[in-house]
């Protein structure tokens, strides 16, 4: 019995839409199922075999398919391993260990081992950024560089929008669309972004997101990051105070490349080329 979907039928519907999106992956790719201690982990591999390796992690409710709008840019110069996280939609095991535990760092160790990568750069967005940060702090020797896009765990979490989202849930499809519009907060959307947005709406019709609070990394911990870091924040993010996050990261890591887009929300556009350039010379 599924632990992350409201019904088994709903889980099947999400996976069918997921597979349909993967069929439209814009670059050559290879699906992989990796063995880890938590269970099977699904990944989509793209990009030149000899390019710098990058493990890409999406946020809550996200899958490898959510990289669809940016994968062509990233995979032009990087070997991208787009990994479905445990307990999230997609085709990875549904286990959800506590976020504050070492379980996710151990899981990512297993992912790297299964891919035969002693180390790799990490790219994470939202909760995926939290997992990338957690791994970088626990296993610095395995993280060559860190690229973050509106990561969780640095800036303060905004509570008021969560209350609105809870209210919108009572209004079915209209409520889900209203919630997604709030999160997008005016971010420009091309055809692929709209397609991924529709998939997100369909996912949250059936998916039960984590209710656990995401642990916050204090400045003192962020100061321990020893690898090159690039971070992109949207000042209009309704979920996280990313202006606060950018200030904290600049305080902790004066040499980091920290960018704050004043007119962008949680779905941050236009970061992929900068990340590809940043990670392109690292392995």
Question: What is each model feature region?
Answer:
Residues 1-53, 77-78, 118, 279-283:
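Alpha/beta-hydrolase fold catalytic core
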Residues 42-90:
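Conserved HGGG/HGGXW glycine-rich cap/lid loop of the alpha/beta-hydrolase fold
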Residues 58-60, 120, 124-129:
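Conserved alpha/beta-hydrolase "nucleophile elbow" surrounding the catalytic nucleophile
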Residues 81-123:
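Active-site loop/oxyanion-hole signature of alpha/beta-hydrolase fold enzymes
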Residues 130-138, 143-173:
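Flexible "cap/lid" loop of the alpha/beta hydrolase fold
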Residues 157-159, 171-227:
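Conserved alpha/beta-hydrolase catalytic His-Asp/Glu region
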Residues 209-251, 260:
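Conserved serine/cysteine hydrolase catalytic core
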Residues 255-283:
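Catalytic active-site module of serine/aspartate enzymes centered on a nucleophile-bearing elbow/loop
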